[in-house]
Swiss-Prot record:
High-level lineage: Bacteria, Bacillati, Bacillota, Bacilli, Bacillales
Gene3D superfamilies found in the cross-reference section: 1.20.58.480
Annotated pathway: Amino-acid degradation; L-tryptophan degradation via kynurenine pathway; L-kynurenine from L-tryptophan: step 1/2
Signal peptide as annotated in the record: none
Protein name as annotated: Tryptophan 2,3-dioxygenase
Keyword terms: Dioxygenase, Heme, Iron, Metal-binding, Oxidoreductase, Tryptophan catabolism
EC number: 1.13.11.11
Organism: Bacillus anthracis
Length: 279
């Protein structure tokens, strides 16, 4: 072996793990890396599985950060929440890039194993549903999808009835003294949020006097960041689906691309977008 080809091993590097935990054990890699089970013999099904599993792991972290941010804002601890929400945006940017990898799957390749999926579909992702709930887009009718698993159904039911990120953001406006209409404060939070003139007026005042309401302004911009990234994710999802299956019906029974295009019109924080026109 030539001198420049020698493997450099520092003396302090640990090599005896008979009584110590290894990297693989800490991350439970045996379990994690044995979860990619193809239902067909097609080579590209592994890509399909890994992309979706990796996205679910990132969504788990998004939920971890969102729920912590919601609790932090409830307790008037906005600065820690800003860090958590900024991290959510970074994770979102990472997930968006995964569509570029999935887009390497051609229609001819996908059709070889698509039937193996049966009725399984990303539409059924319970973590994505919980992210929507955490952001304020509540869809009670969607709970029926998860009745097969009572424990999971109960978790989603709890998430449906929990205050969303936008709920606690509006409460932060109230604590600052903004007059928010009682219908907003007493609304059924299990239903999709509908924009309100008093909420818009409050955010407009925040944006008109940034120095006075700096923390609320920062909070608003963090929310905009998250919705912006989410819409980019939705768009890349729609275009990747169109690229691979065209306008076929989705495996979950949806209209596919047509449904995904309609979803692009859904907004989580409507007043924060409206104030940009009003300023």
């Amino acid at each position: 072996m030539k001198e420049n080809e020698k493997v450099i091993m520092e003396k302090g590097i640990h090599t005896d793990f008979k009584e110590n935990m290894t990297y693989g054990e800490y991350l439970q890699l045996d379990s994690l890396l044995s979860s990619q089970k193809r239902l067909s013999d097609h080579h590209d099904e592994m890509l399909f599985i890994v992309i979706h599993q990796a996205s679910e792991l990132w969504m788990k972290l998004i939920l971890h950060e969102l729920n912590a941010a919601i609790e932090s804002i409830k307790q008037d601890k906005l600065q820690p929440a800003f860090k958590m929400l900024a991290r959510v945006s970074k994770i979102q940017s990472q997930i968006i890039q995964s569509w570029d990898i999935l887009a390497t799957l051609t229609p001819s390749e996908y059709i070889e194993f698509r039937d193996s999926l049966g009725q399984a579909s990303g539409f059924q992702s319970y973590q994505y549903r919980m992210i929507e709930y955490a952001l304020g887009y509540k869809t009670p009718h969607a709970l029926k999808i998860y009745e097969k698993d009572p424990e999971l159904h109960a978790r989603l039911h709890t998430a449906l009835h929990a205050p969303s990120l936008y709920n606690v953001a509006i409460q932060a406006l109230v604590k600052e003294g903004f007059p928010i209409h009682k219908d907003v404060l007493n609304r059924d939070i299990t239903q999709p949020y509908e924009e309100d003139a008093t909420v818009e007026a409050a955010w407009l005042e925040v944006y008109a006097d940034v120095k006075k309401y700096w923390n609320l302004y920062q909070l608003a911009e963090k929310l905009i960041d998250i919705e912006d990234w989410l819409q980019q994710w939705r768009f890349r999802h729609m275009k990747t689906v169109e690229r691979i299956i065209g306008h076929k019906m989705g495996t979950g029974g949806s209209s596919g691309v047509s449904y995904l295009k309609r979803v692009l019109d859904q907004r989580f924080f409507p007043e924060l977008w409206n104030v940009r026109t009003k300023l």
